[in-house]
Amino acid sequence: MNIHEYQGKAVLRSYGVSVPNGKVAFTVEEAVEAAKELGTDVCVVKAQIHAGGRGKAGGVKVAKNLDEVRTYAESILGTTLVTHQTGPEGKEVKRLLIEEGCDIKKEYYVGLVLDRATSQVVLMASEEGGTEIEEVAEKTPEKIFKEYIDPAVGLQGFQARRIAFNINIPKELVGQAVKFMMGLYRAFIEKDCSIAEINPLVTTGDGKVMALDAKLNFDSNALYRHKDILELRDLDEEDAKEIEASKYDLNYIPLDGNIGCMVNGAGLAMATMDIIKHYHGDPANFLDVGGGATAEKVTEAFKIILSDKNVKGIFVNIFGGIMKCDVIAEGVIEATKQVGLELPLVVRLEGTNVELGKKILNESGLNIVAAESMTDGAQKIVSLVG
């Protein structure tokens, strides 16, 4: 789960991580009032959406007086911001962060992520702050420094100091930088984050180490023990189809292709997408109906897939272990009738009650193409979609 920058900074502040003072605003008048309350000579007006690249898209403005705060708030609020992370459709700006300006001396990058290769949290840092870390990794990987953290003991002070020296934090500010990184790590672990990214981390003219931006992502599977974080969820920032899928315990991720996929099991779902790509097709989604899908869940899964106007055909690929193939077959038929499906539909069933499932499909009288294997199914749906 993602949260907004201002929310992330509030979480970090509670762990002793230094962030600029700021207030959220939902209207132009609230933005002006927030700037008045901050009482600083310079304010930064920042669009709040769940995407990076806001500055380049015109969503971050420096205001030197209240009139400029009003002007920028009017120009940003209610507009659709298109960045490299939003896709061409962009995201509507419904709230702003009004933040005190600061005298930036140098920008850095600091982030914590899970390294799946080592099964450890890794602290990454670079003195190339303010730019996309992926770009730094591609062009100048030698400028990224890493510390792998033993989960038994956590981030150690010497590791944070080594990072601070490697990215050339001024010696007199190393102590602050270490405290910053230790607080960031505590927030990451205690709040079950999957990403904690500060870009940029800055040193200021008055000798402070501060997070100028904050991106926190949380493990959705751990939200049951973080009610305070769950309350920060902004449904307006999420894909409507993903929200609908979550109501039925369906795992759905939209993609850019035109072949809808309905599969049980994440591994099989990824293999299905791979084989569709192998035969020169493009999957429109990842959709895992799970191991205990009912006919109702299958019907809802169809509706979600078909709500994507780019979908030109559907491939259902089910291995019946916990889930029985006859239940899936009944769900497919019910869904096809309910939604009035006119698109090509290829179904591959294997496992528990597979013969009964195939019999139900064959006797349905519907235009359903049966596949004998995953390869056969992928080839057929790619051919039908054209």
Swiss-Prot record:
ATP-grasp domain location is 9-244
Please identify the protein, giving its name as recorded. Answer: Succinate--CoA ligase [ADP-forming] subunit beta
List the Gene3D superfamilies: ATP-grasp fold, A domain (3.30.1490.20), ATP-grasp fold, B domain (3.30.470.20), Succinyl-CoA synthetase domains (3.40.50.261)
- PROSITE patterns linked: ATP_GRASP
GO terms classed as biological process: succinyl-CoA metabolic process; tricarboxylic acid cycle
Family annotation (SUPFAM superfamilies): Glutathione synthetase ATP-binding domain-like (SSF56059), Succinyl-CoA synthetase domains (SSF52210)
Q: Which reaction does it catalyse?
A: succinate + ATP + CoA = succinyl-CoA + ADP + phosphate; GTP + succinate + CoA = succinyl-CoA + GDP + phosphate
Q: What class of enzyme is it?
A: ligase
Which Pfam families does the record match to this protein? ATP-grasp_2 (PF08442), Ligase_CoA (PF00549)
Instruction: Give me the comment on cofactor binding.
Output: Binds 1 Mg(2+) ion per subunit.
A single MF term (Gene Ontology): ATP binding
Q: Organism's domain of life?
A: Bacteria
Names of required cofactors: Mg(2+)
The major lineage groups are:
Bacteria, Bacillati, Bacillota, Bacilli, Bacillales
Q: Which residues bind substrate?
A: 264, 321-323
Give UniProt keywords alphabetically: ATP-binding, Ligase, Magnesium, Metal-binding, Nucleotide-binding, Tricarboxylic acid cycle
**Residue positions binding ATP:** 46, 53-55, 99, 102, 107
Query: Which residues are recorded as binding Mg(2+)?
Result: 199, 213
Family indicated by similarity? Belongs to the succinate/malate CoA ligase beta subunit family.
| A GO-annotated cellular component | cytosol
**EC number from the UniProt entry:** 6.2.1.5
List the pathway annotation. Answer: Carbohydrate metabolism; tricarboxylic acid cycle; succinate from succinyl-CoA (ligase route): step 1/1
